[in-house]
Amino acid sequence: MAATAAASSLQMATTRPSISAASSKARTYVVGANPRNAYKIACTPHLSNLGCLRNDSALPASKKSFSFSTKAMSESSESKASSGLPIDLRGKRAFIAGIADDNGYGWAVAKSLAAAGAEILVGTWVPALNIFETSLRRGKFDQSRVLPDGSLMEIKKVYPLDAVFDNPEDVPEDVKANKRYAGSSNWTVQEAAECVRQDFGSIDILVHSLANGPEVSKPLLETSRKGYLAAISASSYSFVSLLSHFLPIMNPGGASISLTYIASERIIPGYGGGMSSAKAALESDTRVLAFEAGRKQNIRVNTISAGPLGSRAAKAIGFIDTMIEYSYNNAPIQKTLTADEVGNAAAFLVSPLASAITGATIYVDNGLNSMGVALDSPVFKDLNK
């Protein structure tokens, strides 16, 4: 993402590449004429993961990653945030639906929002709730909770949630009797929204990080109607339901985001069971919801099309490691995509800095979506890369 300095007061830029080394000196370039009003842009590896650099020493020189992100800093003190262009979510409250562990995109989004100052509430799938809360309580996630200032991300409250059910009347008897739901209550979308209202009054940010396709490994021609509709229900309509029920308690000027995938518009063999259709529906719904929520309550709605990540949930696809390798070999930016990069994009999208962005699909995939033909195709075997 390129940053443009529109105001004359932004005069200096500092970039610090992070290439597997522990640290490197920043370079400063004067881009304006008035150094007394200058600001510095200091580099951090990731907003939500300051100082955690990946060791690429085992990779060939041509395949080592090179990335930097920027954080506005005052010239008088590089340890204090500048009033220039910070992502500031202090005083904001976010509800993130779909976190069940610490290695997916939902967790990374939560961490980036927390790093920017937001208060974090989480909705966790009921069968995973006990394990998730126990892991939090026993400190299993403490290492991945570390924020740039050294503190641990605080999850203010974890709510049970099954977003395929809008209200208690929708829950079938076999689910009510299922032992995995025993001991939990108020976990439909309607009930979760009401519990958040009772506990906190309102929220500013709603994040949808939910997807499930029970027949994802099946080709579309072999997918049952039940499996197809289940994928749509869990992966796309759940966003409509969440926004519909949480909108009344969202503060005007807030924002909502979801996570999608390039299979919505390109053929990804193996990503079946109706999941490609579900992602296409999610993106289409994003545009409609942006209009409706925007006009009704000044709420922005966007979706992030993230590249492949080897999370526990993605392992269900079966070929996720192949997709990660494919992305590395063929994307314009040849590096491994991290969850933090998606989290940081989310923090930007829900912040006032993105106040004019709504109804958009934002690609965070090292540019893979822009490619027409894979570079590892035999067509390009003699191409000088």
UniProtKB/Swiss-Prot annotation:
Tissue spec. comment: Seeds and leaves.
Active-site positions on this chain: Y261, Y271
Summary of activators and inhibitors of this protein: Inactivated by phenylglyoxal by binding covalently to two arginine residues.
Record protein name field: Enoyl-[acyl-carrier-protein] reductase [NADH], chloroplastic
Entry keyword set: Chloroplast, Fatty acid biosynthesis, Fatty acid metabolism, Lipid biosynthesis, Lipid metabolism, NAD, Oxidoreductase, Plastid, Transit peptide
Record flagged with keyword Nuclease: no
Binding site for NAD(+): G98, Y105, D162, A163, S209, L210, L259, K279, L309, G310, S311, R312, A313
Entry's Gene Ontology molecular function annotations: enoyl-[acyl-carrier-protein] reductase (NADH) activity
Taxonomic path: Eukaryota, Viridiplantae, Streptophyta, Embryophyta, Tracheophyta
Enzyme Commission no: 1.3.1.9
Alphabetical list of Pfam families matching this protein: adh_short_C2 (PF13561)
Reaction it catalyzes: a 2,3-saturated acyl-[ACP] + NAD(+) = a (2E)-enoyl-[ACP] + NADH + H(+)
Role this protein plays: Catalyzes the NAD-dependent reduction of a carbon-carbon double bond in an enoyl moiety that is covalently linked to an acyl carrier protein (ACP). Catalyzes the last reduction step in the de novo synthesis cycle of fatty acids. Involved in the elongation cycle of fatty acids which are used in lipid metabolism. Required for normal plant growth.
Catalytic EC class: oxidoreductase
InterPro entries (alphabetical): Enoyl-ACP_Rdtase_NADH, NAD(P)-bd_dom_sf, SDR_fam
Assembly notes: Homotetramer.
Cellular location(s): Plastid, Chloroplast
Pathways involved: Lipid metabolism; fatty acid biosynthesis
Transit peptide as recorded in UniProt: 1-73
Entry GO terms, CC: chloroplast
GO biological process, one term: fatty acid biosynthetic process
Protein family per UniProt: Belongs to the short-chain dehydrogenases/reductases (SDR) family. FabI subfamily.
Principal localisation: plastid
